[in-house]
């Protein structure tokens, strides 16, 4: 007997050159916000496909061309993004704790990375892989983890970018700076969750922004959350 599988795929290339992001060789700005599937208060994590698609449509109507998912999603989500031109960063669900990941976390992350690439690499909407979100970006252990996982994703899938999303890029004094550079600088794109004037830097916004720009100099900088 024979077996057949049918799926949609597309061809595109997202690359980095200096501080520019290029889509098929042309400079582009990644504009958007994160979205957490399962956020609908009426459905919770049992969110049906039509509700997920309604939220994705809202992103398109807000002129977003990019979003990120904190954890892996069903193929149906990516099929919608494929069809509607919404670029995605799919992330390993490593968020906040532990602040400095060790070897056990790294082993689990590598297992999940392998499964993510195997399951979703045919989706052109996925342009980046994410190795984590909001750890202690100034910790040497976090930096080592990010460098290892970015290299691991590149080994699995050389065609895509790999990044870490930081909430500490602007923390010049708030956390001990074991590392000279924030961990996000070891990904392809410098990704920063920006809460200036709300959660931090209420009294010295200008100083914080100057520090961020100095840190990110020479790399693309994308705001991945804001508030």
Language-model-detected regions and their locations in the chain:
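Extracellular glycoside hydrolase catalytic/binding regions
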Residues: 144-227
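Active-site-adjacent substrate/metal-binding segments within catalytic domains
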Residues: 2-147, 162, 190, 221-222
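Short, positively charged
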Residues: 1-2, 202
């Amino acid at each position: 007997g024979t077996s057949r599988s049918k799926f949609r795929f597309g061809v595109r290339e997202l690359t980095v050159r200096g501080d520019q992001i290029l889509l098929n060789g042309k400079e582009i700005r990644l504009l958007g916000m994160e979205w957490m599937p399962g956020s609908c208060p009426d459905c919770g994590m049992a969110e049906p496909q039509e509700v997920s698609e309604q939220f994705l449509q809202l992103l398109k109507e807000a002129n977003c061309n990019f979003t990120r998912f904190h954890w892996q999603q069903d193929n149906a989500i990516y099929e919608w993004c494929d069809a509607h031109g919404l670029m995605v960063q799919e992330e390993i669900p490593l968020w906040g704790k532990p602040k400095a990941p060790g070897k056990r976390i790294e082993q689990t992350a590598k297992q999940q990375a392998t499964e993510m690439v195997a399951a979703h690499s045919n989706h052109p909407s996925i342009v980046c892989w994410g190795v984590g979100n909001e750890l202690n970006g100034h910790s040497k252990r976090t930096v080592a983890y990010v460098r290892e996982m970015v290299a691991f994703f590149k080994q699995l899938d050389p065609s895509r970018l790999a990044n870490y999303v930081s909430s500490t890029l602007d923390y010049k004094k708030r956390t001990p700076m074991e590392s000279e550079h924030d961990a996000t600088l070891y990904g392809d794109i410098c990704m920063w969750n920006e809460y200036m004037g709300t959660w931090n830097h209420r009294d010295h916004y200008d100083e914080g922004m100057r520090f961020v720009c100095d840190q990110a100099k020479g790399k693309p900088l994308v705001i991945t959350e804001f508030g």
